[in-house]
From Swiss-Prot:
Keywords (A to Z) from UniProt: Host cell membrane, Host cytoplasm, Host membrane, Host nucleus, Membrane, RNA-binding, Viral matrix protein, Virion
Cross-referenced Pfam families: Matrix_Borna (PF16520)
Chief place of localization: virion
GO CC, alphabetical: host cell cytoplasm; host cell nucleus; host cell plasma membrane; membrane; virion component
Gene name, Swiss-Prot/TrEMBL: M
Subunit details: Homooligomer. Forms homotetramers. Interacts with phosphoprotein P. Binds to ssRNA.
Protein species of origin: Borna disease virus (strain V) (BDV)
Protein name: Matrix protein
Localization: Virion; Host cytoplasm; Host cell membrane; Host nucleus
């Protein structure tokens, strides 16, 4: 990728068992299949993400789904300064979010994006709570 910016990979270590999770949900449309979607754990947080009502996530967060080989796909994203500060303040893991980042999809996830010809219909960050053992898991540590 020939880019003006350096994209940093968002690693799995930002997901901490026993804490609420922000889930990146991507709906694809087009290609050889209909209604392809992905749910990707994005970030463990101390409290739910709340954005101002008058704004949409797309005002703060832009994604681009691109091939990273013959059968693998990366999701690139650019994060507005407001959302960047908000996510880093909510994150369980200290300051993991940068303005320009990407996620590597595994083969199964990549297959969905490829079948939809990388055509993103919509995306969102959804707050997911912890299960009944979350507090116990959190106190015992990973």
């Amino acid at each position: 990728m020939n880019s003006k910016h350096s994209y940093v990979e968002l690693k799995d270590k930002v997901i901490v068992p026993g804490w609420p999770t922000l889930m990146l949900e991507i709906d694809f449309v087009g290609g050889t299949s209909r209604n392809q979607f992905l749910n990707i754990p994005f970030l463990s947080v101390k409290e739910p993400l709340q954005l101002p009502r008058e704004k949409k996530l797309t005002d703060y967060f832009t994604i681009d789904v691109e091939p990273a080989g013959h059968s693998l796909v990366n999701i690139y994203f650019q994060i507005d300064d407001f959302l960047l500060l908000t996510l880093n303040s909510l994150s369980v893991y200290k300051d993991p979010i940068r303005k320009y980042m990407f996620l590597r999809l595994n083969k199964d996830q990549s297959k969905h994006a490829i079948n939809a010809a990388f055509n993103v219909f919509s995306y969102r960050l959804r707050n997911i709570g912890v299960g009944p053992l979350g507090p116990d898991i959190r106190s015992s540590g990973p």
